[in-house]
């Protein structure tokens, strides 16, 4: 295919529509399974600063895993878009923290400290066998990862239905170190 940008846009739209069509019961089951994998396979996260996200448009819901890691001693943070062309800023989050409406109507912590995460749990629209992700197309996570002097551990989270043979990564795309789906955990090139 000549125009990979158009292909990526088409795949993005299809994958989001498919994800949003999943029943609430199935979504909860898959999310719980992913949370179980995260809690069991990444025990080290209990002592780390974890950048998570607030679920949007049918994404895996990390809130139960967030609560588990927070209760285990981890410091949690949610991303905030401060400028369309700059890296994300992560603000400390805990249960019952005051929230405000951020970019794309996604809640963000209000008035909390900025945190530089040791690990990022990253939402995925699509992913491939090499750990590259297809995101929403704005490049926030790629800019954020490129800005860190020491990159954090990256864990993409998705449903198996979001797996693609190849996302046709662009030059600036950064592969994730792990991807966790309801089928299991995958490291590096899988």
Functional labels for PLM-detected ranges:
Residues 1-116:
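N-terminal active-site beta-alpha-beta segment that forms phosphate/nucleotide-binding
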């Amino acid at each position: 295919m000549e125009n990979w940008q158009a292909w990526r846009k088409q795949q993005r739209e299809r994958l989001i529509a498919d994800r949003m069509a999943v029943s609430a019961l199935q979504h909860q089951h898959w999310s719980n399974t992913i949370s179980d994998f995260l809690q069991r396979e990444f025990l080290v996260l209990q002592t780390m600063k974890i950048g998570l996200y607030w679920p949007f448009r049918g994404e895996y819901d990390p809130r139960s895993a967030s609560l588990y890691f927070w209760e285990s001693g981890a410091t949690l943070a949610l991303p905030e878009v401060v400028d369309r062309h700059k890296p994300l800023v992560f603000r400390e989050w805990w249960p019952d923290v005051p929230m405000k409406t951020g970019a794309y109507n996604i809640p963000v912590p209000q008035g909390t400290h900025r945190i530089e995460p040791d690990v990022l749990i990253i939402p995925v629209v699509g992913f491939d066998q090499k750990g590259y992700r297809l995101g929403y197309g704005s490049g926030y996570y790629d800019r954020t990862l490129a800005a860190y002097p020491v990159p954090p551990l990256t864990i993409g989270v998705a449903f198996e239905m979001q797996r693609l043979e190849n996302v046709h990564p662009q030059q600036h795309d950064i592969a994730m170190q792990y991807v966790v789906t309801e089928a299991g955990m995958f490291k590096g090139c899988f």
